[in-house]
Amino acid sequence: MEVLISRYRNIGIMAHIDAGKTTTTERILFYTGKQNRIGEVHDGAASMDWMEQEKERGITITSAATTCFWNDHRINIIDTPGHVDFTIEVERSLRVLDGAVAVFDGVAGVEPQSETVWRQADKYNVPRICFVNKMDRIGANFYRCVDMIKTKLGASPLVIQLPIGSEKDFKGIIDLISMKAIIWQEETLGAKFSYEDIPSDLLDKAQEYRNLLLDAAAEMDDEAINTYFESNDLPIDLLKKCVRSGTIKGKFVPVLCGSAFKNKGVQSLLDGVVDFLPSPIDVDVIIGTDPKDSEKKIEIKPSEKEKFVALAFKVMTDKFVGSLTFIRIYSGKLKSKSAVLNAGKNETEGIGRMLLMHANNREDINEAKVGDIVALVGLKKTITGDTLCSSDFPILLERMEFPDPVIEIAIEPKTTSDQEKLGVALNRLVAEDPSLRMSVNAESGQTILKGMGELHLEIIIDRMKREFNVEANVGAPQVAYRETITKSVEIDYTHKKQSGGAGQFAKVKIKFEPLEPGFGFQFESKIVGGAIPKEYIPGVQNGLELIKEGGIISGFPLIDFKATLLDGAFHDVDSSPLAFELAAKGAFKEMANKAGPKMLEPIMKVEIITPEEYMGDVMGDINSRRGSVVDMLDLGNNSKIITASVPLANMFGYINVLRSISQGRAQYSMHFSCYEQVPQYVVDELKLKYN
């Protein structure tokens, strides 16, 4: 079906775990005719949750792509995970999407992962609309949820719909644009609905919220301001145009509501996607850089007449077709059996097949164009974040940032036959998942696997067994500690070796200084006048990059510091990049105990929903874990939300303790917050353990 690019909508469905993302997506696929039955998550039958682990656990683990059509518009959808351990899937999806639907649990409102994905969408300037889901559940409160969107996310919610009833009395919605009530017929699984007059007891509230809608929308357009001033109202088409404009500019976020599981509100959500979210030609201009000159900016126009440019945002292994590379096309066209340039690696890649995906189902296509999201078969060198383009139009698009792992496990093959298979399996899994890291412990020879959480690594081990038939012994999870420095020091260091054969000489003067948390490692050269030839300076940086991974105190990577190369000296014959690399390492070792080294540990933001009667016990347990309560919120319905900061080291196995404290009635979620200094008594314990 040929669709104009102005009628494309590339969207993601994002939310906290269990807010109902996948259920909402399944209803969208049913009502758009993409599938002829409703797949339920709790039955393990959701088409978008196709992995065995997803079916068994009832959660989304990997982002799944699909395409459907609504009101002559093509909607490319990516359903993303809600569990914090798989936040990389959200990150790379939002990087290539034009808009998003943020789904909220009508009872819990804004939850920790809701905040995380919201900030990720902010980072990429992704316009979004909100869907307050589960309005049929006990304790659902639409107005509290809207308030939380404002206070916890710092957003400007613009209410477009109001619920008619709540909990078991939830019947439908009031559309504030048309000022009509929409009532769904339950016997048709929500496929049929009717427009009716607004119930008289809700008319005043509807008018109140419509006035707020008109006030905000009219400011988006000069014509609308004049019309609103003259008539105190706006025609429906002009009102929609204004809401769309404000949404795309990020002035506000439209808020809709419903119950996906009860089949209410999904069609009007689809209308909202079409009416308010941008097409590829409505978003900010895409700017790339010249691979040979990073200062030279190149503008990309979203037109199929332009040269081909795309971003690879995901690589995965398919047991039937091999490696699949998912791309978003930003300009031009692409044909199967053609060749493209990987601009970052300056390598030509041949495309075997081109596929349109529906979760794990594949449809071969011969051509794709600007705005399309497709999977390519046959690429050998391309990884997540690489730019693909026409060979005569080299360009680099902005890469994605991936979070550092916070937890690690030691892993070793059970048998010698598993040894080689383990390496192959891990290399493929690491290639798929940029938040998964692998290294080898130099002393023990053990393979160390690092990830975003216990569940993340548990799934990886399970996939190794199922997909690669590898059996492995796995150690207990360990915290991925870090180290940093707290003082600035300058080090003069000379590396000299002249005992027979070719000599080595390099002299460096390096200033080491602490950085604010989150800044990682920075290197700067202030060499002027040729004190060190420029071809030797990368050797200094490389030496520091390598040695910082071993840390100072207990062998953990050193982070959040800057090294500035101030001065140095060289020898015409005996100097080399290697000599300067060794000099940098020597300077680092000399700096180690002079710069006030400290150990850092990952601190988690923990959110617990508990019945009020267990609140004291829950808070007491948090305090015993070196945690601190930072906020409490009354959910109503005898429930409280406790927000706390707790070291990850003290959160292993927490779910079992929480169940015991609350007789199984409390639940929690957590995500990485920051690194903080470890108390000295804990450092002493860690030294005994790791040194």
UniProtKB/Swiss-Prot annotation:
InterPro entries in UniProt: EFG_II, EFG_III, EFG_III/V, EFG_IV, EFG_V, EFG_V-like, EFTu-like_2, G_TR_CS
Protein name: Elongation factor G
tr-type G domain mapped to chain residues: 6-281
One cellular-component annotation, GO: cytoplasm
Binding-site residues for GTP, renumbered to this chain: 15-22, 79-83, 133-136
Subcellular location: Cytoplasm
Family from the record: Belongs to the TRAFAC class translation factor GTPase superfamily. Classic translation factor GTPase family. EF-G/EF-2 subfamily.
Family matches, as PANTHER family: RIBOSOME-RELEASING FACTOR 2, MITOCHONDRIAL, TRANSLATION ELONGATION FACTOR G-RELATED
Short name of one Pfam family: GTP_EFTU_D2
GO function terms (MF aspect): GTP binding; GTPase activity; guanosine tetraphosphate binding; translation elongation factor activity
PROSITE patterns (alphabetical): G_TR_1, G_TR_2
One BP annotation, GO: ribosome disassembly
Task performed by this protein: Catalyzes the GTP-dependent ribosomal translocation step during translation elongation. During this step, the ribosome changes from the pre-translocational (PRE) to the post-translocational (POST) state as the newly formed A-site-bound peptidyl-tRNA and P-site-bound deacylated tRNA move to the P and E sites, respectively. Catalyzes the coordinated movement of the two tRNA molecules, the mRNA and conformational changes in the ribosome.
Domain of life according to the entry: Bacteria
NCBIfam families per record: EF-G, PRK12740.1-5, small_GTP
Gene symbol of the encoding locus: fusA
Keywords on record: Cytoplasm, Elongation factor, GTP-binding, Nucleotide-binding, Protein biosynthesis
Lineage: Bacteria, Pseudomonadati, Pseudomonadota, Alphaproteobacteria, Rickettsiales
CDD domains: EF-G, EFG_III, EFG_mtEFG1_IV, EFG_mtEFG_C, EFG_mtEFG_II
